[in-house]
Amino acid sequence: MLLKVLPVGLLSVNCSIVVDEESGEALVVDPGADPQRIIKELEPFELVGIIATHGHIDHVGQVKTLKEHFNAPFYMHPADKFLLSNPLWPGFERQIGANFPCPDPDVELKDGMEIRLGKSKLKVIHTPGHTPGLCCLYSEEDKTLIAGDLLFKGGVGRWDLPGGSREDLRRSLKRIFSELEDDVLVITGHYEETTIGQERLFNPYLRSLFV
């Protein structure tokens, strides 16, 4: 499995392009901005799905553009549908250049679901807290977690936006840190990648959440 991470937009959302090199099939995760750049990266491949880890506008801002260009299905957890027409703050959609509102998902993500990409597969892990429907995508073969805004290097997702829950976030983080090994690479929703082990040792927010 080939993974390319493109930081896009004003908020540096990590848009992940996942490719099965043998079949040439590709998935794109969290296409929040910079649609022409994303399209250029995807053109050599067959795009078979557009996935949002959650429904915040900075992560779904160009889903509509990619659906129209590639005619590929959109995957998201149904609990976040209410966010697809919510800019979070007045005028935020214009500030970040979103193609808004985002369409409803064609395929609903569910915990434990496997998304196949040629011979590769991504497991869906439902991890609410930042939003009710946030889902991580895990490649067991490559020991890589696409975490959306669940976890950051030195931080965790905020829980004070619509649908957020501190208690759900606590449970989701406990699940991730109990199920995954320390050498798992974490592609965060914004900024630098990290590992489960590094965050287990050094993330101050985890200590406060687990008290």
What are these regions (language model features)?
Residues 18, 53, 127:
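Conserved S/T- and glycine-rich ATP-binding loop of Class I adenylate-forming
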Residues 22-23, 33, 57, 80, ...:
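Short, glycine/acidic-enriched loop or turn micro-motifs at the edges of active sites
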Residues 27, 51, 74, 146, ...:
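Residue-level marker for buried hydrophobic side chains located in beta-strands
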Residues 33-116, 120, 201-205, 209:
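Active-site HxH/HxHxD metal-binding segment of metal-dependent hydrolases
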Residues 92, 121-210:
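Metallo-beta-lactamase
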